[in-house]
Regions:
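Fe(II)/2-oxoglutarate oxygenase catalytic core
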Residues: 1-111, 119-144
Length: 144
């Protein structure tokens, strides 16, 4: 499963979240509104070990699925992210899915949701400039 919810955040709200680099609580009002959008699509839980953070990571992420490279996030059944800075504020930093390796996703203000199925293996390329994203990892109801 992979879905995109377009324009999930306003320009102003994206900028507000971009200023909050680090771990962030699911009850933060802007994050909470995004979680509500996630819950419209999937049954997930926000209790630990689920977590969210605003990330500024110029080194990107190598190819992986969100259960962790060593299985350390085996509880993760759904991930979601929103690019919080406009693509013109950085270079590189594309989100790629293995099944579409030539297509970069620059999901500014769009909520991208995907499950932890191996078919959703993805990476984020190195970036220069100001690239920030909200990333959220959820455990499933069945993982209780």
């Amino acid at each position: 499963m992979r879905e995109i919810v377009s324009n999930a955040l306003s320009v102003r709200h994206a900028a507000e979240l971009a200023a909050l680099v680090g771990y962030i609580d699911f009850t933060q009002p802007l994050v909470s509104s995004l979680v509500d959008r996630v819950l419209d699509i999937a049954s997930v839980l926000t209790a630990a070990p689920s977590y969210a953070r605003v990330e500024a990571r110029p080194e990107g992420h190598p190819w992986h699925v969100d259960t962790g490279s060593k299985g350390h996030m085996g509880w993760c059944c759904l991930s979601a992210s929103v690019l919080l800075t406009p693509p013109e504020s950085f270079t590189g930093g594309g989100l790629y899915f293995r099944d579409e390796p030539e297509t970069a996703v620059y999901h500014y203000r769009d909520l991208v949701l995907y499950d932890s199925d191996p078919g959703n293996e993805h990476c984020v390329t190195r970036s220069r400039g100001d690239r920030r994203a909200l990333i959220m990892f959820f455990r499933g109801v069945e993982n209780g």
